[in-house]
């Protein structure tokens, strides 16, 4: 039986590729997709969800737009990474259908309520929508199997020295998610920076030769440019968000540890930092499965294999 999931995302090149991977995978049943502000403004990320689903011919999936800003802060966007549209690079279709009239939280709640089994929430942007859902619907917590997030880092940040972008945008929301008592799986920079796509991998995807694999290659062409800055020391581009979907499909290609994680909301230098109790120093029980390593070749092979689904 396919695993029911809700995807909350802020497309974003890597979010878009996570959608491509999820919708090429019969092991997963994508029940709803909600958009958050983050990589771009809320209007643009919602439009990008609709553009991707139009491209993938999946207007049957309910879509709703989410919170327009973080719980307690002003919105920061990553247009320096993702461009003016949020998905700069390829020529994507205009949306062929409209989102639902309700909010992301309403769509998530309805989806959970109507599901006969617990649903996994995959969140690849800031945690604002998920936190709002948890706070407004305590009666639905039992219907959430787990929350798989792309965010945080045990080590170095990518937006500030201490903080990864998604968590930094809304640290209060992320703290609500981690302390919710619902199992959390964290794909942080420790693993996503190892899930790098190299130039040869992009050519491999392009050579698959179907319209979707070509678009993925073009998304990666653009995404590569930002990551060529030598300060990162990367060979390729880290494909952050697809790690969440890849873990659901093939957990064996990832190495994980069970640890307690808290989010710093106040620090002078460390706001948005995910504090991972690696050495069990706090006495707190683990609340998260933290990804720490990935078989890069296995990850690339999984993407290439699933891109052939669109032939």
From Swiss-Prot:
Cited InterPro entries: I/U_nuclsd_hydro_CS, Inosine/uridine_hydrolase_dom, IUNH, Pyrim_hydro_RihA, Ribo_hydro-like
Keyword set, alphabetical order: Glycosidase, Hydrolase
Protein EC: 3.2.-.-
Top-level taxon of the source organism: Bacteria
GO cellular component terms, A-Z: cytosol
Residues spanning the membrane: none
Enzyme class at the top of the EC tree: hydrolase
Gene Ontology BP terms: nucleobase-containing small molecule interconversion; purine nucleoside catabolic process; pyrimidine nucleobase metabolic process
PROSITE patterns given in the database record: IUNH (PS01247)
A molecular-function term among this protein's GO annotations: purine nucleosidase activity
Gene3D superfamilies: Ribonucleoside hydrolase-like
Active-site residues, Swiss-Prot/TrEMBL: 240
Pfam families noted in UniProt: IU_nuc_hydro
Family: Belongs to the IUNH family. RihA subfamily.
Chain's role: Hydrolyzes cytidine or uridine to ribose and cytosine or uracil, respectively.
Annotated protein name in UniProt: Pyrimidine-specific ribonucleoside hydrolase RihA
